[in-house]
């Protein structure tokens, strides 16, 4: 090694150590002038020896040539958003759910319950990013994006001073994805805006916008000039576990050079969490950065895994938001808009006012119950808040300023769009097998797809990227199609002719043919996409995937009883009833029939087949008895009944003596009384019959999964696949019992490598793992009876 190489390595190590002490420990050991001298020496040596410059050198933070666009990055583990709490009662409800999910004893709603340990830290108001390290070196930075797909901003994150280009120390996993927030301090924000003003450039409304705009610059030299900082708050994919607790993980990351929150704290129980929230709230204005709340996470990693996730958020974490900034203004009018499901909702038209740096002239009123709760009248002076710092909301009426000519807000008797009758429907709450009428009500236009507003929103949803994905059908085009009476339902899209399209504004020969081709190309949708496209109330993309993966066919989804639907992951009784009601509706049946009829629209659904293996294996007699919500009978007692009698009919017909052999007197009496009610017995039998008609049987206990050909195996997908998406490939592997992981390790059984496979394929070859190309993978699936 030459003297220059040796000195360059020494300088890099020394500068990395000083960066760590300055940005992470806040304990600088040399003056800034000495740091600058060392930095200049390294820069000069690298200029003399450009062949020795590496991407992890401290000198590489200055930015490089501008990009034309960012490339997309798929997150192997989705970057989910957090659920929100706005009041103390929301936090106590979260704590109750955590205790319930961990099967811990919980007190009453305000009693604190069991003392679960939570990590606490301020919720920085910035931009969420993912940093991927391979063997301790930063190889990629990405934005959160939609949680599944983000943008590759690697060249920009390298310019953020306190992000280590190379980890300190040793002992880190080979693959380590760090997640955190890039933000701008209040002081940095003020300096940036002052500089922008002086240069005649654009100023930013708030530090968050400044941070987001700076990080997404195509010219990384601009990013390098901005006062950005990073704070780590968690992990994504890792090739090996680090610690048993969330705080333990963060402490290890700090040792490796990652900046973590100086306000990080452990709280025992919900009351300590609330104390922390109040303390941070009192200090909020004094903190050097903007925050919009506090994040609480169950500290135990094992407990986090046990609690798992909802469709879009973890069950083990929550963001307790601070009250947003508020302003006074005048309510000029209340107008009514009609949504996709026909709900008629009020919208406040306001005297424009600035709230948190944004001019607000409209605000949500949610529903007429909210209008009544507020006691709102047109002409009132109201307090406007940006709820969650995003959606403007009317939160209070200043009644002492009410003018004499103030007018009450009245729901229209007929739809403001189509003139159809507006009906009031009382809301019904369903829980644990019981229905109760709630105080709330919803007003709906009964015009359905005859209502232009509902039809437009339904079509916009139907053609959207995550639904049928029909390119070229923008909102304005859909408005034209509806206004010109060219479509009256989603099925009419597939009946459009060239002559009709070319007459639309903005269309010519090429664009008309392109749209017709896009419509034709959408005729073979995956089952999950089709279900999502139908616009079933409360059924989002993730729930649609669960329905498709678990039930395997549209016919089963259409037939499923609400009680059977609750057997699916994350489908509660409310959503189950919405799904069931949607498919019971004769108009919806007609539209679906037209879409699927070969002599009409001719859609052919893909990925239909048998019941999902995990779903089939998860439904047992004991589980079914538990889900009947028999009073005093929990999972343990339900399993005792299943073990004793072996069939539902056996439980229903059991005499008192046999029942007492299985259960204590109180529980036995509850079971007997439950099934003595003919309606309960008939419902239980109907559920059993449907489950069995779907292909399930009580012998399909968990052990059935173990009988699947890939049970216990871990597979990895890498590169691009040409015959199917990676999501589809993942579903097919999971149907055979495999676990699909995001990283390669010695425990990986097989790697499926498509074109463009990189480090994962190299790692697989290094470890001597089995590797299949796409052709071999398709043959493997065919051999195991999985359609491709």
Curated annotation (Swiss-Prot):
Entry annotated with the keyword Metal-binding: yes
EC number: 6.5.1.2
Catalytic machinery residues: 123
GO biological process, one term: DNA repair
Pfam families per UniProt: BRCT, DNA_ligase_aden, DNA_ligase_OB, HHH_2, Nlig-Ia
MF annotations from Gene Ontology: DNA binding; DNA ligase (NAD+) activity; metal ion binding
Manganese keyword on record: yes
Positions annotated to bind NAD(+): 32-36, 81-82, 121, 144, 181, 297, 321
Disulfide bonds: none
Catalytic activities: NAD(+) + (deoxyribonucleotide)n-3'-hydroxyl + 5'-phospho-(deoxyribonucleotide)m = (deoxyribonucleotide)n+m + AMP + beta-nicotinamide D-nucleotide
A GO term from the CC aspect: cytosol
Record key words, sorted: DNA damage, DNA repair, DNA replication, Ligase, Magnesium, Manganese, Metal-binding, NAD, Zinc
BRCT domain span: 705-788
Database matches in SUPFAM superfamilies: BRCT domain (SSF52113), DNA ligase/mRNA capping enzyme, catalytic domain (SSF56091), Nucleic acid-binding proteins (SSF50249), RuvA domain 2-like (SSF47781)
Binding site for Zn(2+): 415, 418, 445, 451
Family of the protein in this entry: Belongs to the NAD-dependent DNA ligase family. LigA subfamily.
Job description of the protein: DNA ligase that catalyzes the formation of phosphodiester linkages between 5'-phosphoryl and 3'-hydroxyl groups in double-stranded DNA using NAD as a coenzyme and as the energy source for the reaction. It is essential for DNA replication and repair of damaged DNA.
Protein name: DNA ligase
The organism's taxonomic lineage, starting at the top: Bacteria, Pseudomonadati, Pseudomonadota, Gammaproteobacteria, Pseudomonadales
């Amino acid at each position: 090694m030459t003297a220059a190489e040796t000195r360059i390595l020494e300088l890099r190590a020394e500068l990395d150590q000083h960066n760590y002490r300055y940005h992470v420990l806040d304990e600088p050991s040399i003056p800034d002038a000495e740091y600058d001298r060392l930095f200049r020496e390294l820069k000069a040596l690298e200029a003399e020896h450009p062949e020795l410059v590496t991407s992890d050198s401290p000198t590489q933070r200055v930015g490089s040539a501008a990009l034309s666009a960012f490339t997309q990055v798929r997150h192997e583990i989705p970057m989910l958003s957090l659920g929100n709490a706005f009041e103390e009662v929301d936090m106590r409800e979260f704590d109750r759910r955590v205790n319930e999910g961990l099967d811990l004893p919980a007190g009453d709603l305000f009693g604190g319950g069991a003392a679960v340990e939570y990590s606490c830290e301020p919720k920085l108001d910035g931009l969420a990013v993912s940093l991927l390290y391979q063997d301790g070196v930063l190889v990629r930075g990405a934005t959160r994006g939609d949680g599944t797909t983000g943008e590759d901003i690697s060249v920009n994150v390298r310019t953020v001073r306190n992000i280590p280009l190379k980890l300190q120390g040793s002992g880190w996993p080979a693959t380590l994805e760090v997640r955190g927030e890039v933000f701008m301090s209040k002081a940095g924000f003020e300096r940036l805006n002052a500089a922008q003003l002086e240069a005649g450039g654009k100023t930013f409304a708030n530090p968050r916008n400044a941070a987001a705009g700076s990080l997404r610059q195509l010219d990384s030299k601009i990013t390098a000039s901005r006062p950005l900082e990073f704070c780590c708050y968690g992990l994504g994919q890792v090739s090996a576990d680090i610690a048993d607790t969330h705080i333990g993980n963060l402490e290890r990351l700090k040792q490796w050079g990652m900046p973590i929150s100086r306000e990080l704290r452990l709280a025992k129980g919900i009351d300590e969490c609330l104390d922390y929230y109040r303390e941070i709230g009192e200090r909020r204005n004094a903190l050097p950065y903007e925050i919009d709340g506090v994040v609480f996470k169950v500290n135990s990693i094992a407990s986090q895994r046990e609690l798992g996730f909802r469709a879009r958020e973890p069950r083990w974490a929550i963001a307790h938001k601070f009250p947003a900034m508020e302003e006074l203004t005048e309510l000029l009018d209340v107008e009514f808009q009609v949504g996709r499901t026909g709900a008629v909702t009020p919208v406040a038209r306001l005297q424009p006012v600035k709230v948190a740096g944004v001019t607000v002239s409209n605000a949500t009123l949610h529903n007429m119950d909210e209008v009544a709760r507020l006691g709102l009248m047109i002409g009132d002076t109201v307090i406007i808040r940006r709820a969650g710092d995003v959606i403007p909301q009317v939160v209070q009426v200043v009644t002492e300023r009410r003018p004499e000519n103030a007018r009450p807000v009245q729901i229209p008797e007929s739809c403001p769009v189509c003139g159809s009758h507006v009906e009031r429907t009382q809301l019904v709450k369903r829980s644990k097998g019981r229905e109760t009428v709630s105080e709330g009500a919803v007003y709906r236009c009964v015009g359905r797809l005859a209502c232009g507003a509902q039809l437009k929103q339904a079509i916009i949803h139907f053609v959207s990227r995550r639904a049928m994905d029909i390119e070229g059908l923008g909102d304005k085009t859909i408005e034209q199609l509806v206004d010109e009476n060219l479509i009256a339902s989603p099925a009419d899209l597939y009946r459009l002719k060239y002559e009709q399209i070319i007459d639309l504004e903005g269309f010519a020969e090429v664009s008309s043919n392109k749209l017709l081709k896009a419509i034709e190309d959408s005729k073979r949708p995956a089952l999950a996409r089709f279900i999502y496209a139908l616009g079933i109330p409360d059924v989002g993309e993730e729930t649609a995937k669960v329905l498709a993966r678990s039930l395997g066919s549209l016919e089963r989804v259409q037939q499923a009883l609400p009680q059977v639907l609750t057997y699916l992951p994350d489908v509660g009784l409310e959503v189950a009833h919405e799904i069931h009601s949607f498919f019971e509706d004769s108009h919806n049946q007609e539209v679906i029939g037209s879409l699927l009829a070969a002599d009409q629209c001719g859609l052919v659904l893909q990925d239909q087949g048998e019941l999902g293996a995990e779903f089939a294996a998860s439904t047992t007699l004991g589980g079914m008895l538990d889900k009947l919500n028999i009073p005093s009978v929990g999972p343990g007692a339900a399993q005792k009944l299943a073990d004793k009698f072996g069939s539902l009919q056996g439980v229903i017909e059991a005499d008192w003596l046999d029942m007492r052999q299985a259960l204590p007197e109180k529980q036995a009496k509850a079971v007997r009384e439950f099934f003595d009610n003919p309606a309960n017995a008939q419902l239980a039998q109907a559920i059993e019959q449907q489950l069995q008609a779907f292909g399930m049987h009580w012998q399909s206990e968990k052990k059935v999964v173990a009988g699947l050909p890939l049970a216990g195996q871990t597979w990895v997908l890498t590169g691009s696949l040409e015959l199917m998406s990676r999501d589809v490939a993942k579903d097919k592997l999971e149907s055979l019992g495999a676990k699909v992981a995001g990283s390669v390790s010695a425990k990986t059984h097989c790697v499926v490598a498509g074109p463009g496979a990189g480090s994962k394929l190299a790692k697989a070859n290094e470890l001597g793992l089995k590797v299949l190309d796409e052709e071999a993978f398709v043959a493997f699936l065919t051999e195991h009876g999985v359609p491709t």
